[in-house]
A protein has these predicted regions:
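Short glycine-rich loop/turn motifs
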Residues: 27, 184-187, 258-260
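A glycine- and small-aliphatic-rich helix-loop capping segment at beta-alpha/alpha-beta transitions
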Residues: 5, 138-142, 256
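N-terminal FAD cofactor-binding segment of flavoenzymes
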Residues: 1-35, 132
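Well-ordered beta-strand positions
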Residues: 31, 85, 190-193, 255-256, ...
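Flexible, glycine/charged-enriched surface loops at secondary-structure junctions
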Residues: 229-241
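Redox-cofactor-proximal catalytic regions of oxidoreductases
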Residues: 23-56, 181-182
Length: 265
């Protein structure tokens, strides 16, 4: 779920219907779950999503890359950035990864060495614990006052038999209450058009039980009568997982820019 305001400002001449998204949020529900029941609770301000869009990040990024190319940007698909170039205290670009190496790192007949890609400004948007951003943050000592906490999210996309109209968030079961467990997190269930939903669970990674599995927690949630009713008659299409920064403003570097580079996410 995302606020569409920035996209509308970025693409003022594009009709909202032409920007990839599944639906506009009409209603929302938040539940405190128990093993066999649920209690609806008021949605906190940060979960007020009426008018926001349900989007696929990959589809939106693909569309935005096409818009950028039309404006003259040059994309390097299937190319990773391996190393930051820092020259005389300034970030001057990156070195891309080698191509054409085997599983053991050996050079194949298609081997191509990595190349330097230099720029006046290098924009870092790697997400959690980016290896390039980490080097820059360390080099410029930007993490002296930041506190890092992490969460893990797993999700599934389902084709369902009946449409889901509301954006749903839950907390509580299957996680366990109590200081000794240190378990916190919750789930989402989002409509993706008339016949698909995204369902997922996020768990804070400072839990005490080393055997806790975020994947297993999601599978437990799917056995709840309410969730089971949403998925009944459907089929799972895809599955994925990612880490999420949980420390908010306290996890930001002391500066969002350094000579030759800036952080955007």
């Amino acid at each position: 779920v995302m606020r569409p305001g920035a996209l509308k400002e970025l693409f003022p001449d594009v009709a909202p219907a032409d920007i990839p998204h599944y639906t506009e949020v009409e209603g929302e529900k938040v539940f405190l779950m128990t093993k066999g029941g649920k209690v609806r609770i008021p949605a906190p301000p940060q979960l007020h999503n009426k008018g926001n869009w349900v989007v696929s990040v990959s589809q939106l990024a693909r569309w935005m890359s096409e818009q950028a190319e039309e404006l003259g940007a040059f994309m390097l698909p299937e190319t990773d950035a391996q190393k930051v170039l820092i020259d005389r205290g300034r970030v001057v670009g990156v070195v891309t990864g080698d191509k054409g190496r085997g599983k053991e790192g050996e050079e194949l007949s298609t081997f191509e060495p990595g190349a330097e890609v230099r720029a006046k400004v290098t924009v870092l948007a790697e997400g959690t614990q980016g290896h390039l951003a980490g080097v820059v943050r360390s080099h410029y000592d930007l993490d002296r006052d930041s506190i890092q906490t992490w969460e893990l999210g797993v999700k599934e996309v389902w084709r369902v038999a009946k449409p889901l109209k509301d954006v749903i968030h839950t907390l509580g079961w299957p996680l366990r209450f109590g200081k000794k467990y240190r378990e916190y997190g919750g789930s989402w269930i989002y409509p993706m058009g008339d016949d698909m939903v995204s369902i997922g669970f996020v768990v804070g990674l400072d839990y005490a039980d080393a055997t806790l599995s975020c994947h297993d927690v999601l599978q437990q949630l799917k056995t709840h009568p309410y969730v089971k009713g949403i998925l009944e008659g459907g089929e799972r299409l895809t599955w994925g997982a990612k880490t999420i920064p949980g420390s908010g403003i306290w996890g930001l570097p002391s500066r969002l820019h350094v000579p030759g580079a800036l952080f955007v996410g």
